[in-house]
Structure formats: structure tokens, C-alpha cells
Amino acid sequence: MITAIIVNYNSGALLTACVTSLLASPGPLKIVVSDNASTDDSIERLLAFHGDDERLMIVRNGANLGFSGGCNKGRPYVSGEYVLFINPDCVVRPDAIERMRTLMESHPEAGMAGCLIRNVDGSEQVGCRRYVPTPWRSLVRVLRLDRLFPGDLRFRTFNMAGTPLPSRPVQIEALSGAFMFVRRSALAQVGPLDEHYFLHCEDLDWCMRFRQAGYTILFVPDVAITHLKGGSQASPLFVEWHKHKGMARFYQQFFRHEYPWILMLLVILAVWARLFLMSPYLFLRREQGIHPDMR
């Protein structure tokens, strides 16, 4: 048995498309939709299509708990040894989940695995495989040092998109929260997602904790899903606020003892300065009705 947990917040018709694709999987499956007090018709639409399917369960939360909180609300209803955390704007192929299960069975050292996440145009989505964004790597990205010193591993950025895809499953440092295939026993040891991250960076935090617990994280290049993006309507400033807040917490959680305190202070200040400089642009996007992807 595999349990899929989907956190929904005003995802519209995308939620139904995601669940429909999951229900096409051949193996035993349970789907838990954790709804963060949506105000649209996404749940009603889903129930109209699949309300009679016993594999589907709806958990109605009384407020918007964020991604981590929504995922954690679904955990008590998990059955089986594997849990798939997947965004509501993702569409999977019928064999994807079973292939991920088979892979995890053959790699007992792996606590979590991710797959190739594609954009609608078929290109690889940035963030589906990456190095941990340490303060140094983030500085490299901001200053574009990877372009000044191509090929120098000291100046590589954290995103791996654009590099050649491996021919087989490989270990990576971090994957995307849009699709996380997790071993339940590892989850019990590592613990739930950190709810201090409302949106973004909770996946990085979890990857760090899984690796600290001795588990590997696998990237599976021959299993692909499509991430449509736009699964939730939120203002650009709201999303970027939580993204920057999450990065500041992530740096403090894992790197405050590895870097001099003055450097960490500068890094945190740089995070908030970046958001401040972006704010006029983000406000303009909100006025134009442009909504970013929540993941």
C-alpha cells in the first residue's frame, strides 16, 4: 500500500487532474487530500468526479496551515510503507508510483526519492534535483560566480537543472517538495515536516534531516511527472515573503555553527535586503493579477 498526501488550497480543476492521474496507478493506493480551508470549488469538483472512490479521503483543516502543516495533518491517515507527498498541480503517469516503490525496495538505504519533474513544454523543472543551497552556494548564484569560473567545483551553484541527466538513479543532496516519495519507517525516525516553514524551504530542511539521520536521497531520472504550476492563487509578495523567511530559518538551523557569526549575519541581512528590493516589482505583479507558483 502507498499513501499519497496532497495539500490543497484553492487549486481549482488542477486538483482533480492530479487525483485522476494518481487513481490510474495499478497498485494498492490511498489518497489523502489535506485541504487548507479552500474557498474555491476545488473539493466540490473533486468529489463530483471521484467522491464514490473508497481510495480517496478528504481532511478538512479549519485554516490555511501552509504546506508543512497540511502534510502533517494527513500523516495520521497513512497506510502502507511508502508515502508520496505531491503537489496538486502535478500529473503522473500510471506506472510512476509503482516504479518508485520498486526502486525504493531495491535501495533500503534510501529514505526518500524524487523523480524527473518536467514543465509543460517538456523541459526539466529547476529545483527537482539540486545541491543544498549553503550560504556560499547562494552567494555564488547571486554573484554569478559559476559563470565566471565554469567547471570549477568551488563555484558551482545549487541548481542541477541543465546538467546532463544521469542514466540511472543517483544520490543527490536535495529534491523538490512537489514530489517526495518517502519511506514511512524513515519518516517515523526523522520526524514530520517543520511547520515553522509555512511555504518553501521545508523540503530542503527535510532533506538535510534525512541525510543527518543516515539515509540517502535518490533522484530517479527515468520516472517523469509534469508539474503544471499555478496550483494555488497567492500574491507574489506573500509567496516571496515566506520563501525568504524560510531561507533565513534554513541557514540559521543548519549553518550557524559552520560559518563565522558575522558572515551569517551578513547572509541573513542579504536575504531580507533582497526581498526589500524585490517588493516594488512583486507589488506590481500583484496589481496585474499575476500569481506565482506556490512550490
Question: Can you annotate each of these PLM segments?
Answer:
Residues 60-78:
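Glycine-rich, basic loop-to-helix element that forms the pyrophosphate-binding segment
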Residues 164-224:
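A short, conserved alpha-helix in the catalytic core of glycosyltransferases
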Residues 205-286:
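Active-site-adjacent helix/loop segment of glycosyltransferases
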Residues 83:
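Short aromatic/hydrophobic "clamp" motif used to bind/position activated sugar donors
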Residues 94-127:
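Conserved donor NDP-sugar-binding/catalytic core segment of glycosyltransferases
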Residues 20-29:
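Short, acidic, metal-binding catalytic loop of nucleotide-sugar glycosyltransferases
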Residues 132-172:
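Short, flexible, basic/aromatic active-site loop/helix in glycosyltransferases
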